[in-house]
Swiss-Prot record:
Keywords: Aminoacyl-tRNA synthetase, ATP-binding, Cytoplasm, Ligase, Metal-binding, Nucleotide-binding, Protein biosynthesis, RNA-binding, tRNA-binding, Zinc. This is Alanine--tRNA ligase. Binds 1 zinc ion per subunit. Consists of three domains; the N-terminal catalytic domain, the editing domain and the C-terminal C-Ala domain. The editing domain removes incorrectly charged amino acids, while the C-Ala domain, along with tRNA(Ala), serves as a bridge to cooperatively bring together the editing and aminoacylation centers thus stimulating deacylation of misacylated tRNAs. GO terms for cellular component: cytoplasm. It is an enzyme of class 6 (ligase). It holds the Pfam family DHHA1. Residues 888-912 are annotated as: Disordered. Its cofactor is Zn(2+). It comes from the Archaea. The lineage of its organism: Archaea, Methanobacteriati, Methanobacteriota, Stenosarchaea group, Halobacteria. GO terms for biological process: alanyl-tRNA aminoacylation.
Amino acid sequence: MSDLDEAYQLDYFEEEGFHRQECVSCGDMFWSRVKRETCGEPPCAEYDFIDNPGFDESHSLTEMREAFLSFFEDRDHERIDPYPVAANRWRDDVLLTQASIYDFQPLVTSGTTPPPANPLCISQPCIRMQDIDNVGKTGRHTMAFEMMAHHAFNAREDIEDPEQYAYEGEVYWKNETVQYCDELFEEMGANLDEIVYIEDPWVGGGNAGPAIEVIYRGAELATLVFMSMEQDSDGEYEMKDGNRYSPMDTYIVDTGYGLERWTWMSQGTPTVYEAVYPDMIAFLKDNAGIELTDEEERIVHEAAKLAGRMDIDEAEDIEAERDTIAAEVGVEVEEMRDLMAPLEDIYAIADHCRTLAYMLGDGIVPSNVGTGYLARMVLRRTKRLVDGVGVDAPLDELVDMQAERLDYENRDTIRDIVRTEVEKYRETLDRGGRRVRQLADEYAEKGEPIPTSELVELYDSHGIQPDMVEEIAAEKGVAVDVPDDFYAVVAQRHGGDDTATEESQTPYEDRLEELPETDRLYYEDQQRTEFEAVVLEVFDRDEDTYDVVLDQTMFYPEGGGQPPDKGTLSTDDVSAEVTDVQQYGDVIVHTCDDDPGKGEFVRGQVDATRRQRLMQHHTATHIVIHSARQVLGEHVRQAGAQKGTDSARIDIRHYESVSREKVKEIERLANDIIQDNITVSQEWPDRNDAEERYGFDLYQGGIPAGEQIRLITVGDDVQACGGTHVARTGDIGAVKLLNTERIQDGVIRLTFAAGNAAIEATQRTEDALTEAADILDVAPDAVPETAERFFDEWKARGKEIEQLKEQLAEARASGGGDNEEVGVGDATAVVGRIDADMDELRAQANAIVEQGNIAVLGSGLDGAQFVVSVPDGVDVDAGEVVGELAGRVGGGGGGPPDFAQGGGPDADALDDALDDAPEILRTVANA
């Protein structure tokens, strides 16, 4: 096996007199200018910059960010703007941005498209959900952070086909990267003798390479990754994940400098939180009534230097580490816990509010899936922390404090979302509390602790936090198994993207790959429906179905939520109906009911009416979502869409139901755009240029591949789109919103019709209204008032009927009739048959129980039905009685001890079953 030792033998290290050494504590190899025993990273060493800043000057976040970016601009790097934290807005394989390299995966890193600049520098906001349980405890972890970075994208000069990559040659590599790092430290005034470069090979996403962790005074301030290998079962290098890797044609400098930690290093505060958001920490402490004495301040500062040991990813037992830290500081562990726990919660609240500001500010809407689930999880955990530590400020106010710092313009929407979510959480807790008590009873009976799997399910289904489960379970004497990384476990469970797509497959895929790309004529003239082409290949699918490939086509294949065109392919001898059109790679396949013949010249005719309706609905989809964003807010984004000939639907991410007034406003705005008869234009710009001009709202309908992307512009709305569209908005005619419904939490479906389909939908509604008016014998405009009057009368008569039923039940209960009274111990049971519906049976049973008697009633109205009701204080289980009775009529039933119902199909056995009732009652009572 070959390792990466040689990869770290840098000329720069040799020139600067670095020594390669092994840490006596953890065994890692590292480089430093002076001889030392350990690598300097916790737990091998403590933080050595608390009250001892590592740089010449104290910097704020803003100042540190500018210092970094300016440093690299001075070294010929181009500064680019940061991307959103919601990575699924430009890629479909991840949810959140966790590193600056996410901005360039997979298209740039694979060489498919060029980077926006090369080399470049950026300060990228990131969110790492896996760090959530460490936040507040270690003093250094933040779930939301900015990764300052510089990147260089290189391609080897000896590759066979350099034109297949979007960049070429070497910009710079390892020596220059380490030198830049050293120079940055020097410019900040760091003591270069204290800097340690730890060898730590990197693996991720099928790629790998040597990497270096940069440690200064106990803090990891940077990671320098040299992505240069790809997974290969026959590869030369075996990496720490157990897989083998080989060099790849491209090699990339991927660095990460934590903005928050650099700022912390410059200030030397006890934790990173005081350095990053001092005003909010001060506000939270004051609001929660936390005031520290001088001695308590001393303890906090001393403990902070050792807090790096509290990393749940490294420590085997967090509480044992706390015991050790308390002993070293010289206090009892309980005193340490009582002092630090509220502070840790305060730190977590500040961090989580910043995370929420990033999430909601970038348009993530809380829901039960994907990024929405993660936002909801953070919000609910934060609310629990706020309540637990005694902060009485509303959560929306706390999140807004961070949103203001981050300069988001949609702060009103952010606050509205938080308020809505807090109210939903309250309702969820009311429902979920009952489930926790039930679960506690179950495990109390088993004599087992409530396991982690149940905790995760409680959190997913009801939003119940582990500490609430512990509190309720303790009342029942039941332990709870809460792992230290509980929230990371939950987040990982929902870490996959919620927009997975299925790739089309065909049994002759290999043969399709040999065919040339189909020329797509429908992009040249979307209104044209006739064309001529040559048949390149015909595949026999079955006896009467053929898949035909042409050199060019006007038929649009299914894609982007738009169904395929239909029509005919004709020769002098054959007229084949085109029933389906699909795209496989660059080849378009037409499914036909006849074989036009390979090599034949064909005339294509697209169904013009169908094409026109689909174009109207597709362009209308763009207009409707643009209108929805104008009315509901910029957070609104497409979650799915489907176009048809009679109607279309678009699913949007929104945090509450859409009122009728809002629907009408969306509809009015959409029709204004249509009446303005705006030109619908298409262009094919470079991807980077398009993203720079319009941002990632381009990708409402999905993320296209390729260096150039097709943009459709309708007024102020610009989207990347591959569908067919009308030439001007006036060609749509009109749009009518037909329905709105919540299809899942955080997703609203808008169904609408356009063009003639809108007229037809309106006519159907008018027909229904006219028919209702005829039935009610009133004018159409009087239908709502008349329907409301009839409904009120119907409800009133229903109440009268119920009252009469109750009176009849009371009369029967007191008057005897066919009912039989039997003794059951000290109680009396009334047994009888009443051929009535279940409502009346229940009413009479209630009347009998109110008199202090057991009720056993049967009905033969619909099969055989029973109701058994038992008054308080009588030791008879109604569920057991019903079970016995129902068994005699071929059915089943049950319920709680005081009331049960059931039945079966054998109505002929009803009377015999009731005859057995007295004996059943006595047996159950004596059991």
